[in-house]
C-alpha cells in the first residue's frame, strides 16, 4: 500500500465476510488511510451484487465523500441457495449455476462498472 497517497480513501465490497472484514480492519489500522467504506448486503447503504440499481445508488452515496484510491472486492459464494457444490454431474442444477455465476462473476464486474469512475485519476 506504499503507492497510495497519504489520506487515501478505500472501499471494501463484501466487508461482512472473513476476508472483507480483515481488509477493513487492516485499512482502519493504517494511519495513512483517511476513510474506509465497508459495503455488504446489510450495510447502509446496502450492496447486493445482483441488484445493479442498488449498486448504482451505493456508488452515488460513496461518491459524496470524494474520490477513492483503492477498491477491493472480497465477495463470492460457494453454496448457493443452500446447495453445496456438485459432486456428480447428475447433481448439476442450471438455476443454481446461473445464480452462482451472477454472484461470483457478474457481481464483481458490476462493482468495477459502478465504482471505477470514483477512483482518483
Regions found by a protein language model. Name each.
Residues 69-73, 98, 121:
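Conserved catalytic-site loops of classical short-chain dehydrogenases/reductases
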Residues 72-85:
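Conserved NAD(P)H cofactor-binding loop of Rossmann-fold oxidoreductase domains
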Amino acid at each position: 500500500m506504499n503507492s497510495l497517497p497519504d489520506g487515501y480513501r478505500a472501499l471494501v465490497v463484501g466487508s461482512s465476510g472473513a476476508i472483507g472484514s480483515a481488509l477493513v480492519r487492516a485499512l482502519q489500522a493504517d494511519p495513512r488511510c483517511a476513510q474506509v467504506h465497508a459495503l455488504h448486503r446489510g450495510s447502509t447503504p446496502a450492496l447486493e451484487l445482483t441488484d445493479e440499481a442498488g449498486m448504482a445508488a451505493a456508488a452515488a452515496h460513496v461518491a459524496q465523500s470524494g474520490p477513492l484510491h483503492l477498491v477491493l472486492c472480497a465477495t463470492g459464494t460457494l453454496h448457493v441457495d443452500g446447495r453445496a457444490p456438485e459432486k456428480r454431474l447428475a447433481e448439476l442444477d442450471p438455476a443454481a449455476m446461473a445464480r452462482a455465476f451472477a454472484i461470483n462473476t457478474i457481481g464483481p464486474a458490476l462493482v468495477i462498472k459502478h465504482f471505477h469512475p470514483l477512483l482518483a485519476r
